[in-house]
Amino acid sequence: MDKGGKTDMGVRHWKTGRRILAVMLAGCMLLSSAGCGGSSQAGSENAGAQEEPEGAGREGQSGSGDEGQDGMQEEGQAGSENGASDGAQDGMAGGNKAGEATEEITDVTDTIPLNVIDDSYRTYYEVFVYSFCDSDGDGIGDLQGLISKLDYINDGDDSTDTDLGCNGIWLMPVNPSPTYHKYDVMDYYDIDAAYGTMEDFQELLAACERRGIKVIMDLVLNHSSSQNPWFMEACDYLRELGDGEPDVSECPSFAYYHFSKEKGAGCYAVEGTDWYYEAQFYSEMPDLNLDSEALRTEIEKIAGFWLDLGVGGFRLDAVKEFYTGNPKANIEFLSWFTGVVKERKEDAYLVGEAWLGISDYAQYYESGIDSLFNFAFADKGGIISKVVNGSPASRYGAESAALQETFGQYNENYIDAPFYTNHDMGRSAGYYAGENSEKQTKFAGAMNLLMSGSAFLYYGEELGMKGAGKDENKRAPMYWSKDAEKEGMCAGPPDMDAFEMKFDSLEEQEQESDSIYHYYKKVIRIRNQNPEIARGEVTYLEELSGDSFCVLRKQWEDSEIMLIFHTGEGTEELDLKNLTLNGAEISEKSIRGTLETGEEKVVVTGQKAVMPSYSILVLK
């Protein structure tokens, strides 16, 4: 649910699946001077899990931008814990003395209402429709399948806590295409027949609007399909032209592409002519000529068509390749397109993919685009993975704070777009091996979701899905069930390797209170309860941070929140003396949430925090 799970302040909301651990005798609590400690169950970690092999780069056919992984110099940390952080404030102490009658204390997050704001700071769920949910049994996911699973993403009901709580969906391409991934568009004004109809798409938008979900769709403007009528008409025209000179008044689409009689890098022959066309990604993906005024007019029509239907914005593919090797021209086009979209729909959200190092992609904010994906923290070589695998926790905080200055110098209104993995990267469950791999998988996911900006979550990451190597493996079917024949299950992309998942399917994880799935739900809930997390200006508290601790303060408007990440493998204590939040000293009453990845709970006593391995404390 988007704004879901609100409860009146002070009222305990007992979640489904929580259990009373011991029956309380009448008057027991009043007579017991010792009180009751909150007991907890945590999950057994996947002790022998082996790390999956990491894939080599992206296939040329992905069409999703440059293959080069950005080389980030800094790394950093954050963390989180399973959704069963049962004894938040009074009951966080763990076990109780022998003979004491106790009950499990409701998590503090259950008593805090959601505070979801309808703006551009959201939690987006990336959906590859092909592999998400199949409604008609043909093995291919479709729009009706996605509609049937919207309640999983967000049911729009504040009285429930059974959904993830994402309030945005990023749809990978849904336009007609000859390939499974659909990053080569044949028709920019329609829906691929394998996914459904335009009526299905409109039904999806209406269902999302009722739930408070903003839908952004992938818009591929760097290139089209070679089967796009624009390209086919231009090639036919050149064949008929013979030795004559092209005239765009005779064939307007000739100007939509880069045709030349000289073969340059990344160029391919137009069969039956002495002409060549540019296609930097793949021969069947001819590059569009974005200098063409006629094409820009067409692009303006395309954007307006989808915005008028109710789409909330666009994810722009491969923005650094619009004019390969020419950042200035790329930024100029982005600036033009941003202006076109905002004039049509002021609150439309735009996020661009510029797979570059931070100092290089930061300059694209000069275009005025809302967001750029934060590649610095993503993937196996990014800051999050490095910190979880042993780099100093402090580097997560230092880099988080530094980003503000780097991006802000180009656009003070930027909105960061942190993500951990996407359809071009190996899935994060393969980044970690050994007895702590499940803890690390959880913790790393929280590090991403607790960052400022609009956070993005790739479908299935909340289950710890596996997938590496070639692109098809990274886009495996959503793991609803271990039964591949179960209703809704997809067959997966053609040529996908056969492999087993590392962690349980959703069916099992829903029943496991300490699962990765429940952990992710809790992280998103904390994000939705505290708008400072997404919107706050970051202050890195270097004096409290180090190898195993990272402490961040975020301020939004007149409110502050503090995030403490502990990456150490043992339990450690952090002194919070002399620290204040919102004008008050920190105490047990400051707790807004705890995220643990094992049985041991985070405890705040006085002005000290005792934190087990891979845990997070949220204070306000």
Regions found by a protein language model. Give the residues of each.
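C-terminal motif of bacterial Sec signal peptides marking the signal peptidase cleavage site
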Residues: 32-35
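Beta-strand-rich binding/interaction modules
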Residues: 571-597
